[in-house]
């Protein structure tokens, strides 16, 4: 039986083995609606009830799983070599704060990343740019008084989606019309703050007008056919540069990717979550693994 997290509640009769793939994924935890449970933990208990074996598979184990394995509570099996003996990609950290201070940044892109993108395109290789924020800008702010539009339900800043010309709450899904002026001071100088995948797509198309660019996030993959089309076009070489959120890290392998750029990587460390450092590492490692040739740039 191949199933999602709710499959642990099926009426098994003779269970012998449970395999939890990518056990570190936070999507195994159901918070809303009830019942609230973690499918990985439920699978371990289920297997114990039937006297079955449990296999937790991942390249980036969760902290608790790694502790259980290293302390001897779980058995540990390691793969010492990569498939086809492919070498690990080179990771190049770039200090964008220093580049901003010297005014050398081109929007969200460092000179080094742009150089490697140019080289990859010249060599008919592909590029993946990872930004774990969808939309055009994570926040709109009045440049006169500092007013920021927030969701009336969640009290969080609203994300601006340029294609829809609206503000959206990414927590409850509520949408708002983009105001023409600030309701606090009636000023008209409303500025975008930050950048999401939609903004990255716009900027890349300006910087590399000859390249075929695609974006893969929740907004562009509402249907299964749209998701499959984006992946197929990239695999067939119809797309040169793929811009995406964490979707691009989910078990995808591409043969002709030579550059993966992780934009503003350190922002993932600042999420209001006690697992933010753990999840940042897991995401970066999974995105880097997408490159099966040679990772050149990592911001």
Give the role of each language-model region.
Residues 1-296:
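Inter-lobe coupling/hinge segments of SF2-like helicase ATPases
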